[in-house]
Amino acid sequence: MKKEERIALISSITHNQVFGEGRRLRYKGETKEFKIFEIPMEALIYNVQNGRIGSLVKTFEHSYGVLDPEKPEDSLTIAKMLYSSNEPANKKTRADIAKCGQMEAGIITADGILVDGNRRASLMWSILNDPDADPNEKARCERFRTVVLPENATQKDILRLETTYQLGTDEKVGYNAIEKYLHARDMEEKGFSIGEIEEYMGETNSSVQELLEVATLIDDYLDNCDCVGLYTRLPKGFEDDLLKLNTAIKKIRKGSISWIPTTRLNKVETDLKAVCFDYIRLNMKKEDGFEFRDILQTSGGNFLQNEDVWNDFVENWQNAVDEVEEESIDAIIDRASGDDLERELNKRDNQWREKVKDSMKDAFKNAKDIIDNQREKEKPNALLRKVINALNGVDLETVYRMTDKTELKEQMKEITRLLEDVNSAIAGNNN
């Protein structure tokens, strides 16, 4: 149904039919009661700007172009996005709607765009199009109970309502972690003040600032791995790591890390972001001996607190990732689509991980060992035990077969020198 047809049908209903009681909404700065109408499902279309699926929509449109909810194929794509955003919860809600019908009224514009109720409407359409659905179940889904906004509702009014009644209050089916960051930035770009975003999203002023800062880091992360606009490429657990990174960046900018001179602030911040982005992408786990906070946040000592440790760590990380070649994202998008695209992008990430993981693990472990050893500097017995254990782990057969032993010889000279220093300290203590 085209826009003009939707407007005419909805208008004819709003002038004649009212269902039940009204719904109170905060609209244009006032709390008003709006009547609820029963609108045929064919008069509705998805809101492609829906905050619940912002990351999926932005990723799709970056790869394939703008989604048009009036087109059946694009409408189906949006429905799949809504369902996949929280499949277990959607499965339960669909069963509830099939049994009891729509329980909560939605909000639509005068031309049928869903402001609040995209998820519910998609499940109702799913039931209507299900050949195995019971006729009574389908009958419960033929009309959508909803408030209809005035014709003069602006895009800003619509975004304000969506934010207030979904991101601000909808805890029944939580949004994915990334959506609130993208939504806050969308609101800022559409002219909402920090105070307005705070009010409509139900956040504090400082939380809104943080949402916008992390939204910028999300884009920086995607740019770092050549995935600009592909928001589905963020790995699970990214949120906590980016929040830690954001806190560390603020410390650098405030000059709170004593060893960093003013002339190096930008360089250290740039290195920190690039390092952290690569370790987020590497997706190391605790069982690998990895703690992201060891890089920048551990209270008892982290890599960023010590100039020598930081410089060595950055150099070792740089050596690990330099010269690693990857297929361009554009080339992958040109030859793959849909589920195939997701598989190819996952394959690209996995290939990168295989190339860098051993060296990046070593870079992390070396820095971690130095920090740990500094904590134990008053415990020489423990440190020497680590040396013994490490030397016992050397495979002498491997050493024998090595053709170039230059680096090993240099390391043995350094070990010998250090042991002589320890022996001198022991002998001196005995005199």
Range-by-range predicted roles:
Residues 119-135, 265-297:
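Short active-site loop/helix that positions an aromatic residue
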Residues 81-82, 129, 138-223:
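Amphipathic, charge-rich alpha-helical segments that serve as recognition/docking helices
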Residues 283-320:
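Eukaryote-biased activation of long, low-complexity terminal tails and linkers
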Residues 1-136:
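Short, charged/polar connector segments at secondary-structure boundaries
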Residues 1-24, 31, 35, 391, ...:
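An acidic, glycine-rich, mixed-charge low-complexity segment common to nucleic-acid enzymes
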Residues 11-18, 250-284:
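Bergerat-fold GHKL/Histidine-kinase-like ATPase
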Residues 331-410:
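Charged/polar low-complexity intrinsically disordered segments, enriched in acidic residues
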Residues 226-263:
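Intrinsically disordered, low-complexity basic tails/linkers immediately adjacent to helix-turn-helix/homeobox/MYB/SANT
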